[in-house]
């Protein structure tokens, strides 16, 4: 049988969000003014998938290392769950949580 299967951008955004939130130090996804699904934007240009995540992180985390871990986890998750290879996974840290009390 011939045909095509398509996975909606909303589903891909949910996968990316779930993967990002698995990383230690990621506190939440941050919604912005541009339309995106709970802090995640998926673009699909002729089958080329790009992911942009806007995150809030915990105080004191190593932001570059956390961002790299999110990129890896999201790319692996999309490959495993949707059989897609993202051309890019961009991580934007928009918020840092407050320092712990007494710090």
Predicted regions and their residues:
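N-terminal presequence-like segments and adjacent domain-start helices
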Residues: 1-18
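Hydrophobic C-terminal alpha-helix "anchor/cap" residues
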Residues: 16, 20-21, 78
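Short, well-ordered secondary-structure micro-motifs
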Residues: 18, 64, 99-103
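Short edge beta-strands and adjacent turn/loop segments
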Residues: 23, 27-56, 88, 93-96
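Active-site acidic-Proline motif in GNAT/NAT acetyltransferases
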Residues: 59
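Short, non-transmembrane amphipathic alpha-helical segments
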Residues: 63-82
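Short, charged, intrinsically disordered terminal tails
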Residues: 79, 83-86, 94-103
